[in-house]
Amino acid sequence: MAYSHNAPFRADVVGSYLRPAELKAAREDFAAGKIDAAALKAVEDKAITELVAKQKAAGLHVITDGEFRRGWWHFAFMWGFNGVDHAAAAHRVAFHDEVTPADTATVTGRISGENPPFVEHFKFVKQFEDENTVARQTMPSPAQTRFVLTGNAAAYPYDEFYKNDDELTADIVAAYRQVIADLYAAGCRNVQFDDCTWTRLCDASVRERLGWSDEDALRLQQENLDVINAVIADQPDDLVINTHVCRGNFHSTWLSSGGYAPVAAKLFGEENVDAYYLEFDDDRSGDFAPLAEVSGDKKVVLGLITSKKPDLEDPDTIKARIQEAAQYIPLDRLCLSTQCGFASTQEGNKLTEDQQWAKIALVQSIAKDVWGE
């Protein structure tokens, strides 16, 4: 029996964890043809089983597979759709100080969501649920998938598979709804959309580099909102769908900067998720004022503990920031988490596993002091 409450939790996490050395080695061996898929899966299963035990020992109410079966947080999920495959990217994504490997996702047929591998991945984690934990399935948001597949003109020839972006978007929505229906049937009650599309619209330098005018930015906000809400529409009442709004997280570097104000009205006011996991770990994140736009009884998880650096934050400083956020949204609707995952890609951030768990212990300790739970 799973935990009787669902996310977000007062002490929470985004979901990805540093890959153990044994898993990294196995993935390299698989890529080199030294081991087969079954051997890789055996290593993954062992690593995930051990990770779940560590999450429980840390007192977390949410368990994930750490994204241990993925090299990328987003592409690896997209590649699981029918009609989407791996491709070499024409350009590497430039994070600050580093560039990513040259991977992307490309359309190779009509997109659909039947028989995705991630449902079996979820079932493996689901078996470890108990009276204190809920299994979470993370995935790139529908807007993220749409951005990747429409952002590269070579990604899909209109005349071969789709006449226009609207046709492609309709199939993305249908594919997500199929996957979520299958996850729900497998017992999933906590889905998390990870999304870097909104924060690109918050960064003037990114908008300039991509050639987006102010009108383009407003149009893209509406397109993001429409595709996400179309997937969420009419989902079961006991299925919690939250979103992590990310500024990029590759090897302790970042992709975009800027507060949430430019997108707050649409993102916080109109996106029909249950909660937002938001990054507030440094000066690039802006202030808390945009939280006043969070509508209804939606909750906000404050990502005040950075997952990019090993140094532990001062608890009193974090508590003061929580109280500052509570000026814009009631304290009872706030929670605390790490700012992002610890390994959005298999490279992982620049800290050790011990430092990773120390960060989570800090989240737990502060949450208990603030909310008593």
Feature names for model-found ranges:
Residues 1-373:
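Domain-level signal for soluble alpha/beta catalytic cores
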